[in-house]
UniProtKB/Swiss-Prot annotation:
Highest taxon in the source lineage: Bacteria
Family stated for the protein in its record: Belongs to the MurCDEF family. MurE subfamily.
Protein name: UDP-N-acetylmuramyl-tripeptide synthetase
One Pfam family per UniProt: Mur_ligase_M
PANTHER family referenced in this protein's UniProt entry, alphabetically: MUR LIGASE FAMILY MEMBER, UDP-N-ACETYLMURAMOYL-L-ALANYL-D-GLUTAMATE--2,6-DIAMINOPIMELATE LIGASE MURE HOMOLOG, CHLOROPLASTIC
Keyword Cell wall biogenesis/degradation: yes
Recorded metabolic or biological pathway in which this protein acts: Cell wall biogenesis; peptidoglycan biosynthesis
Organism: Tropheryma whipplei (strain TW08/27) (Whipple's bacillus)
Function: Catalyzes the addition of an amino acid to the nucleotide precursor UDP-N-acetylmuramoyl-L-alanyl-D-glutamate (UMAG) in the biosynthesis of bacterial cell-wall peptidoglycan.
InterPro entries: Mur-like_cat_sf, Mur_ligase_C, Mur_ligase_C_dom_sf, Mur_ligase_cen, MurE/MurF_N, UDP-N-AcMur-Glu-dNH2Pim_ligase
Lineage: Bacteria, Bacillati, Actinomycetota, Actinomycetes, Micrococcales
Length: 509
């Protein structure tokens, strides 16, 4: 279903753009438009269906999935395909443009005006989702409304929902919907794919934040330099008004140096930023199963609090979120006050180091982290709270950077007392080959390593052998709503399977 925007007569909307029309026998001046979408399955009668060239196929090839729409916006290649392949148009107006992206932005801004909402964005390899949700939670605690664009809680039927950053039309629509609901802010994750492919349109962020950069998406960027340059683009050419940069990594330091010294910087390591007037110092400490943190502002104001999420990274991401809010003009004393009154930040992020446990069952952790760095972070956190054995379930995505699979096997083998290698989003790769590549990374005796293709069976097997003081870590899948196999998105919930496994454990079967 397409999110509805501001209604226009199609003829009036066309006058405000430079699109060129093909000859159409039907009259369309009285047609109304109230939505724009690039997803064929969600097109409704009053929508413009946007059919441009995708990564592997052209959008007009999906016209047979469109039941009815106000018009089709395409490019010259799309028109050629329709003419040569005689694809059905059902007398629908066809709008042809020589400038697909720029015209799409003009249309999206008209139908989904977003000029009166303050937008901030977060980029980096790891920590985008949690930092965004933490920032939104802190705003909520202060009585300030914040819309978010997120993959958390999405369903298999939402075709773009598992994109870190939605397609351009969907992003504008979500921001507009938040604005209509009287949200004061909107937070988004800015993936390197979205930055490269123009999915952010001409949105200018009030604050852009950088978390970190570790190897990922090498199938897209080919090397780390290209990956870094994609991220860096968010901080250049007036794409953002201010910046917050984590300088605990070499790429963070480089980004700070290459984009000017006006950014706020945050670090655990004082030697990196003490001379900078906008330096924020963060430190983290273990508090039971959660983590406490101390954040010292450039003026010396000290915030001491904690977050209920498991893992040091979430405490550091909370510090990052606080700095972002301060850059948005939120008073640090106000943030400190709500944290003190609440006794820290208490929240759950589905699929992000999410803990499941009932009675005397083993602790089961479900985590979305699938990069080498994120998986190691999860392993360290899980190991640190485990009195018994750490039992790990790992998978790796098909058609996504195969070079990391051996490293995943090496890490999981080193930290785990028992390892199950299973299948995830194999896509069009042979899942057995993916498992073999992970297994190749496991060093030493492999008697504690088992391959179980079915993720459900792997979960049941892990819980069956676990004792009450053991931890089962399900790493790499999180709250994804489906399994992507051979072009089909099969509805699936790892979290539900974990719940069933724990119910079975409680029943002793």
């Amino acid at each position: 279903m397409t999110l509805q925007g501001k209604p226009y007569r199609l003829s009036d909307l066309i006058k405000q753009t430079g699109v060129r029309l093909t000859d159409c026998s039907n009259q369309f001046s009285d047609r109304f438009v109230s939505g724009i979408t690039q997803i064929a399955q969600s097109v409704e009668r009053d929508d413009i269906f946007v059919a441009f060239q995708g990564k592997t196929r052209h959008g007009v090839e999906f016209l047979d999935q469109v039941q009815s729409c106000a018009a089709v916006l395409t490019d010259n290649k799309g028109r050629h395909i329709m003419q040569s392949d005689c694809l059905p148009t059902r007398s629908t107006p066809i709008l042809v443009t020589d400038s697909p992206r720029s015209d799409l932005i003009v249309l999206a801004k008209r139908v989904y005006p977003i000029d009166d909402i303050r937008i901030f964005g977060i980029t980096g390899t790891n920590g985008k989702t949690s930092t965004m949700h933490i920032a939104a939670k802190l705003l909520e605690m202060m009585g300030i409304s914040c819309g978010i664009s997120t993959t958390i809680g999405s369903s298999a039927s939402e075709s773009d929902s598992c994109l870190t950053t939605p397609e351009l039309c969907q992003l504008y629509a979500r921001i507009f919907t938040a604005k209509q609901a009287r949200a004061d802010f909107f937070a988004l994750e800015a993936s390197s794919h979205a930055i490269n492919r123009g999915r952010l349109g001409d949105i200018v962020l009030e604050v852009a934040a950088f978390t970190n950069l570790t190897p990922e998406h090498m199938e897209e960027h080919k090397n780390m330099e290209a990956y870094y340059q994609a991220k860096k683009a968010l901080f250049l050419n007036k794409r953002s008004n201010s910046a917050v940069i984590n300088i605990d990594t070499p790429y963070g330091i480089r980004l700070f140096k290459e984009t000017g010294c006006s950014a706020s910087v945050i670090s655990e390591n004082t030697k990196y930023g003490l001379d900078h007037k906008l330096f924020w110092q963060a430190s983290v400490r273990r508090v039971g199963l959660s983590f406490g943190f101390t954040l010292i502002s450039p003026s010396g104001y000290r915030v001491e609090s904690s977050i209920s999420l498991l893992g040091k990274a979430f405490a550091l991401n909370t510090c990052m979120a606080i700095v972002i809010l301060c850059n948005l003009g939120i008073d640090i004393e106000r943030i400190d006050s709500v944290l003190r009154k609440a006794g820290g930040l208490k929240m759950v992020l589905p699929g992000r180091m999410e803990v499941f446990q009932t009675g005397n069952s083993p602790r089961v952790i479900v985590d979305h982290g699938h990069t080498v760095d994120a998986v190691e972070t999860a392993l360290v956190a899980a190991k640190s709270i485990t009195r018994g054995r750490l039992i790990t379930i790992i998978n790796a995505d098909g058609q996504r950077d195969p070079s990391k699979r051996k490293h995943l096997g090496q890490l999981c083998g080193a930290y785990s007392d028992k390892l199950f290698i299973t299948d995830g989003h194999s896509r069009f790769e042979n899942p057995a080959e993916i498992r073999r590549m992970i297994l190749d990374g496991v060093e030493g005796p492999r008697k504690q390593v088992e391959q179980i293709p079915s993720m459900t069976q792997a979960v049941l097997a892990a819980i069956d052998i676990a004792k009450s003081d053991d931890t089962v870590l399900c790493s790499g899948f999180g709250d994804d709503p489906y399994l992507d196999v051979l072009g089909k998105k099969i509805p699936y919930s790892l979290r539900d399977e974990v719940r069933r496994g724990l119910e079975r454990f409680a029943q002793g079967t």
